Amino acid sequence: MSGGRFDFDDGGAYCGGWEGGKAHGHGLCTGPKGQGEYSGSWNFGFEVAGVYTWPSGNTFEGYWSQGKRHGLGIETKGRWLYKGEWTHGFKGRYGIRQSTNSGAKYEGTWNNGLQDGYGTETYADGGTYQGQFTNGMRHGYGVRQSVPYGMAVVVRSPLRTSLSSLRSEHSNGTVAPDSPAADGPTLPLPPVPRGGFALSLLATAEAARPPGLFTRGALLGRLRRSESRTSLGSQRSRLSFLKSELSSGASDAASTGSLAEGAEGPDDAAAPFDADIDATTTETYMGEWKNDKRSGFGVSERSSGLRYEGEWLDNLRHGYGRTTLPDGHREEGKYRHNVLVKGTKRRVLPLKSNKVRQKVEHGVEGAQRAAAIARQKAEIAASRTSHAKAKAEAAEQAALAANQESNIARTLAKELAPDFYQPGPEYQKRRLLQEILENSESLLEPRERGPGTGLPERPRESPQLHERETPQPEGGPPSPAGTPPQPKRPRPGSSKDGLLSPGAWNGEPGGEGSRPATPSDGAGRRSPARPASEHMAIEALQPPPAPSREPEVALYRGYHSYAVRTGPPEPPPLEDEPEPEPEVPRSDSEPPSPVSATVQEEESPAPRSRVPAKPATLEPKPIVPKAEPKAKARKTEARGLSKAGAKKKGRKEVAQEAEAEVEVEEVPNTVLICMVILLNIGLAILFVHLLT
């Protein structure tokens, strides 16, 4: 057997024994471009036993076959360590995977590199799961046992399948304490959950809020509220369970918990529940699992006496089941996302109540059956676990033999080529330095944060740290809540002076949609912000105008800004009592006729001259006008004014009739609406009771 150094075209090199044109004996080989290194024994070009080191510092120590890891060996990948069997490059059939910085581990059977079959999963806080696995997830039947509540770890991740995430192979096998897992959409669960505790006395974030009239309708909201009074999520049940020292805010470490919902504001009810629960309370779940979550039939029981038997969905009570309280009382019915929505209490129809009770009994029987199967599967998993431990011990011996072969190969490579670069030890040094730096950073960051800010120590990946404790940036703009509200900009042409608005001319408060009117053009314009029906309603509320007016006074008030009579005073008739004319400039309800428009332009008063007309008391001033033009003008304008007055009188009569109709219709419409609402409520209640 000869030996030496051989350089390949891809940048790799081999230094060691050689026979028949192939690596044989002991030797050291680097991969393409010098990346990666294998040192150990060879058999005509294939690895037999040795150590492979990746550029990241990950290593495999064990046996090989046909160029793949096969047999027994130990893989160090990030902060995870696998010890056990290998089959054609994949983990399995039996093996153990554990975390180097926590107590999290899996012991059992494997298939294609994933947990598959039966095994035991132990979490960082000491909780365990024994049962079936499929494709790296808890699937089938199993038993989940938690540690005492005071020792259970707080789950801060918004999305996580397991406490230490024994599923992921990404990022060199290292999974951050709060790293997300791709398990599908999440359901809002109680805030601050604890590992292994899924019997929640709190409803979901949406159901925990008091149902309003406008969320799901007035009728459905009230009916839902009355039906769920016996639920563990109701307010009355919360108070009773607080007295019995039970708690919520808990879910399984494999469940998904959201801190964004229910963790802020005065409605955060997780703190009192966490404070009142007994620290020695434990919880056990026995039943079905689907896709790493409690789904199907199962039994969950706490050491304090709280027990649920029935159907589950995504770690929540969902379906028909029965909850037994610590004091012996029971509630049973249909659950929907942890809330009892259809119970057997206070039922109107006994037939429907019996159907619900039958479904509850079926759910309880299925849960007890599933619990018995889960206990059997847990016993099988325990036997598989003991076998996996034996394989792990054998893998440790295989790793020792592989290291011996690696040392022989390194010694031979130095003898054959002293200048040959061996990258393996350098990779491992880099990995050790990186781990030391990460550990020092994780130790320094909580010290800097804790004394300075008084905040509890949390992982830096924790979303709760960002959601609830991140202060506002100091250099940013001030909060919008602190700035005074900007004044509303007036509309074009508006004026703050009340005398320039249409309502001010008429002695009324101006409306929101009205536009200001100037003496020249405001009398004949309509406000674009109001429809014609609105103007009719507003006109109807005005005081009734006088039956007739004095044309001369109305005519000459437009010229002199006060009432003037040119002819000799005559005793006015009874229907011509002098009254102020608030309605003269307001004609915005209808488009004016050409004659009335000319009269209104002449009659529009000057600004700020609001002297009421007193024709009965004023004495006429001596005016010397030209006789013939005045008479002609007076005759023409009086004729036009009489026509306009007739039209105005007709319009005002129509407005008064509309007002009377509105007043007559208002009372019956209100009573009719109330009667319809009451009738709908009665029909809805009867319909719901008949359906359920």
Swiss-Prot record:
Gene3D superfamilies: Histone H3 K4-specific methyltransferase SET7/9 N-terminal domain
Biased composition (Pro residues): 474-487
Cytoplasmic domain ranges by topology: 1-670
Region (Disordered): 164-190, 246-273, 439-661
Modified residues (Phosphoserine): S162, S165, S440, S442, S462, S479, S527, S533, S589, S593, S604, S609
Marked site positions, Cleavage: V155, R156, L201, L202, R565, T566
Residues carrying Phosphothreonine: T470, T483
Motif (Bipartite nuclear localization signal): 345-359
Keywords tagged on the record: Cell membrane, Developmental protein, DNA-binding, Endoplasmic reticulum, Membrane, Nucleus, Phosphoprotein, Repeat, Repressor, Sarcoplasmic reticulum, Transcription, Transcription regulation, Transmembrane, Transmembrane helix
Motif (Nuclear localization signal): 488-492
Keyword Cell wall biogenesis/degradation among UniProt keywords: no
Positions annotated as MORN repeat: 14-36, 38-59, 60-79, 82-104, 106-128, 129-151, 285-307, 308-330
Subunit structure: Interacts with TRPC3. Interacts with BAG5 and HSPA8; the interaction with HSPA8 is increased in the presence of BAG5. Junctophilin-2 N-terminal fragment: Interacts with MEF2C.
Protein name as it appears in the record: Junctophilin-2
Origin species: Rattus norvegicus
Gene behind the chain: Jph2
